[in-house]
């Protein structure tokens, strides 16, 4: 997409250099009842439901719902101190927890984001996510109130 206003060609070139985010991988929803939520997506919406996966490093049990163009990830607390437990304490009915984008190079993405003032949560080092690939989370206050997860593909 070329922008005609304010020197469109130069702006287009700059946007190409800065391009980092790939496709939307999934939207994650924290739920108070994992089995009921999965059944609702399967029965009511006819979606294909994956098996529950425990992710102890992240304090969650997840179920992926396959859609034609992306996925929904249902999140349920696993163990003491789960971030989903505290999310559900504030949002007892559940709700959107984060949006997940793919990136080609997680370390380059982190460097570019941090150079622009974005905050990486946790230690700042990638962890292995539910797909077996490195992931990072970005502070929601830096992204219009939305927690962002990035995964290297």
Where are these regions (language model features)?
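A short, acidic/glycine-rich surface segment
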Residues: 50, 81-86, 122
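Short, structured motif recognition centered on aromatic/hydrophobic residues
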Residues: 24, 31, 41, 65, ...
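Vicinal oxygen chelate
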Residues: 4-6, 17-19, 31-39, 53, 63-66, 79, 91-141, ...
């Amino acid at each position: 997409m070329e922008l005609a206003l304010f020197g469109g060609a130069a702006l287009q070139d700059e946007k190409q250099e800065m391009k980092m985010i790939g496709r939307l991988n999934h939207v994650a929803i924290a739920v108070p009842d994992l089995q009921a939520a999965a059944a609702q997506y399967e029965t009511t919406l006819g979606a294909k439901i994956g098996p529950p996966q425990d992710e102890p490093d992240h304090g969650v049990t997840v179920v992926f719902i396959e859609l034609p163009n992306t996925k929904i990830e249902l999140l349920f607390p696993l163990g003491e101190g789960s971030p989903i437990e505290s999310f559900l304490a504030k949002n007892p009915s559940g709700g959107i927890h984060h949006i997940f984008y793919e990136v080609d190079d997680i370390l380059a993405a982190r460097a570019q984001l941090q150079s622009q003032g974005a905050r990486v949560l946790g230690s700042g080092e990638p962890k292995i996510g539910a797909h077996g690939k490195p992931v990072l989370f970005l502070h929601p206050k830096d992204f219009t109130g939305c927690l962002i997860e990035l995964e290297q593909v």
